[in-house]
């Protein structure tokens, strides 16, 4: 609950101006509620209008994206780039291609990205972008033409010292490659650091593909060790999603001794009591781009349920939501607790509703919020930018070791900040406070633009 008058006034004004952007308001409210103890210690923030500036993006770019499909028909989509905050570095955040993309969702993601990037300790500001274009069902040539048209407008707003996008939902290595190629043609320059998630032959980083999923498990393992004197060993793990984050979270959780029994997509989920056959899922999703229900057709002990929301009714010790925002509501959280779940760490962005988070906290569940637990992807993007700047390529083991160190550092920064805020063990409060303080200090030092 917001009790600080200054923060309440800022939020109420924001809610009036952004009434049609519920995801953005949800993200802002969560942060403002968490940072109340910090703001009360710094009355100078109010005088400087710091919070008012923090919750408004520095810039929002909206543009049309015309492209020609394989039938020769002209299609038009809408493109966005939300450049949220550059206090600690150039804007950094992914591009999402999905029909659900709108300005409110991208503002929420850019706002979250600001604090997530701060937690990594790397010099990266917050941003997010994308389009309502749906790459599913499109040919490679259609995707290429769209990506080239998208970058033909976006290129004038980005650069390695200005704004450095990456991939996200619907934007993988194929799309990043097409966009990088178009940027190179338009600018007549090879700026490796202006776009991350690149192929290994033109400046990409080893371990980038695995980074978000691996990082999620490194964070979870460190939290288990330090807060519960426990580990993944022998634990039953439920994972939602079957994209990049879910696949590599499954791989690392299994490597650390857990047994992953579920994966899902937007149509439903599969349950395999023997543990998920990850090699099959990789081939299904990364090569054939098939649906998860095909898993049950080839694995006799597996069952398929045509409702992805029911994945949270499966008994487990650890839940790793890796699909999409607000996928766990109050009822799903209660089902998890009832069935023995004691740890929830988030691989997706804001996958738990505020009501679900209340259920976790009131039942003693170890809760790792997205901005801390899934920061491995952007952390490794930052490491990719470092390699590009050095004109070097690090080994998989070197990148993975740096990633592990960053994720363990994020846990400790979040835990220590939770103690300082009077909420020991509440990693949501801790992550918000730790991420906020670095950004706030930088903003105060850089002055106010009149």
Cite the ranges covered by each PLM segment:
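Adenosine-phosphate binding glycine-rich loop
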Residues: 2-27, 223-224, 335-450
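Flexible, glycine/charged-enriched surface loops at secondary-structure junctions
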Residues: 22-25, 43-48, 121, 158-167, ...
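Structured beta-strand/loop patches that form or line metal/cofactor-binding pockets in enzymes
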Residues: 44-73
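Glycine/serine-rich phosphate-binding loop and adjoining beta1-alpha1 elements at the start
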Residues: 98, 117-233
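General beta-strand structural signal in soluble alpha/beta enzymes
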Residues: 162-166, 190-194, 239, 262-265, ...
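Glycine-rich phosphate/diphosphate-binding loop of Rossmann-like nucleotide-binding domains
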Residues: 196-199, 204-313
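Rossmann-like adenosine-cofactor binding region
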Residues: 268-367, 372
């Amino acid at each position: 609950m917001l009790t600080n008058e200054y923060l309440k006034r800022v939020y109420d004004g924001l809610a009036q101006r952004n009434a049609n952007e519920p995801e953005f308001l949800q993200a802002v409210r969560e942060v403002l509620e968490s940072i109340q103890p910090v703001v009360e210690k710094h009355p100078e923030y109010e005088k400087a209008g710091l919070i008012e500036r923090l919750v408004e993006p520095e810039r929002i770019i909206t543009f049309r994206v015309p492209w020609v499909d394989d039938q020769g028909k002209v299609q038009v989509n809408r493109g966005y780039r939300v450049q949220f905050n550059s206090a600690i570095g150039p804007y950094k955040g992914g591009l999402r291609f999905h029909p659900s993309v709108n300005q409110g969702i991208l503002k929420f993601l850019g706002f979250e990205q600001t604090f997530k990037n701060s937690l990594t300790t790397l010099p990266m500001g917050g941003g997010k972008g994308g389009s309502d274009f749906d790459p599913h069902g499109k040919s490679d040539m259609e995707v290429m033409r769209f990506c080239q048209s998208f970058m033909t407008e976006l290129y004038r707003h980005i650069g390695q010292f200005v704004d450095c996008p990456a991939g996200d939902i619907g934007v993988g290595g194929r799309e990043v490659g097409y966009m990088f190629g178009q940027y190179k043609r338009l600018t007549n320059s090879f700026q490796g650091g202006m776009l991350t998630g690149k192929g290994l032959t033109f400046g990409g980083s080893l371990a980038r593909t695995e980074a978000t999923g691996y990082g999620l498990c490194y964070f979870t393992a460190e939290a288990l060790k330090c807060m519960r004197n426990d580990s993944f060993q022998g634990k039953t793990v439920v994972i939602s999603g079957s994209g990049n984050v879910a696949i590599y979270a499954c791989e690392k959780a299994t490597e650390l001794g857990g047994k992953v029994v579920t994966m899902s997509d937007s149509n439903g989920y599969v349950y395999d009591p023997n543990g998920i056959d990850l090699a099959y899922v990789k081939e299904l999703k990364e090569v054939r781009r098939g649906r998860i229900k095909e898993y049950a057709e080839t694995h006799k002990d597996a069952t398929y349920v045509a409702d992805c929301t029911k994945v949270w009714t499966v008994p487990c010790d650890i839940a790793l939501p890796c699909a999409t925002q607000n996928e766990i509501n109050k009822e799903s959280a209660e089902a998890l607790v009832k069935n023995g779940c004691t740890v929830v760490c988030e691989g997706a962005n804001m996958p738990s509703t505020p009501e679900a988070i209340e259920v976790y906290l009131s039942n003693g569940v170890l809760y790792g919020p997205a901005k801390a637990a899934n920061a491995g992807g952007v952390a490794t993007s930052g490491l990719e930018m470092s390699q590009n700047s050095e004109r070097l390529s690090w080994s998989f083991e070197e990148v993975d070791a740096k990633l592990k160190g960053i994720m363990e550092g994020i846990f400790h920064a979040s835990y220590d900040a939770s103690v300082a805020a009077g909420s020991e063990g509440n990693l949501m409060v801790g992550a918000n406070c730790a991420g906020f303080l670095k950004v706030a200090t930088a903003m105060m030092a850089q002055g106010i633009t009149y």
